[in-house]
Amino acid sequence: MSITDVACDWAAHDPDPETAAYVLDLLEDPARAAELQSRFSGPLTFGTAGLRGEVGAGESRMNRAVVTRATYGLMDWLGRQVEGPRVVIGCDARHGSSDFYTTAAEVISAAG
């Protein structure tokens, strides 16, 4: 898939209308191709301190879509490892933490 295809797919499935609109704006402006490349050059990776990155639109930034996908993956794995898993979610004062907390809680709740 091209960067454009990945970005279009991302915007179509982004649960946050603001970040989805930002990606669509990037796609419409050829002068911002480098920024589009930066945001879609590969997914944000889970490191020793968890998911960390600049908050913003795209697969390589912290946003609700990344939190949704990561939480879904965690719950899928955890559900195969433990019967009736329990999960604790925390948040802090960093920008977006409360929204990310709520998003993770919604995914966990939907997973049962």
Question: Which ranges hold each PLM region?
Answer:
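An N-terminal, well-structured beta->alpha segment
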Residues: A7-A104, A110
